[in-house]
Amino acid sequence: EPDSAADTGTEAACSNYDLKKGCAKIFDPVCGTDNILYSNECLLCFQNLQRKTNVRIKRRGTCQEPSPR
């Protein structure tokens, strides 16, 4: 259902990370569907694991909507 992608976000690629080892300290921010800014995709996955949640990626970069020019 591609139409709903805007509402539900994109699945984070959590299988790409070894979450038991933790996440690299890189700043490549993603905004979760919980409207929280995560420093990188791995940290979003890590929080999902810790909290038993399924937060998805709402957008890459900050959570603020780009302001219209």
UniProtKB/Swiss-Prot annotation:
Disulfide bonds: 14-45, 23-42, 31-63
GO cellular component entries: extracellular region
Site residues by UniProt (Reactive bond): 25-26
Described purpose of this protein according to its UniProt entry: This is a trypsin inhibitor, its physiological function is to prevent the trypsin-catalyzed premature activation of zymogens within the pancreas.
InterPro entries listed in its UniProt record: Kazal_dom, Kazal_dom_sf
Chain ranges of the Kazal-like domain: 8-65
Locations listed in the record: Secreted
Name of this protein: Pancreatic secretory trypsin inhibitor
Keywords assigned: Disulfide bond, Protease inhibitor, Secreted, Serine protease inhibitor
Species of the source: Struthio camelus
GO MF annotation terms: serine-type endopeptidase inhibitor activity
Lineage: Eukaryota, Metazoa, Chordata, Craniata, Vertebrata
Keyword Metal-binding carried by entry: no
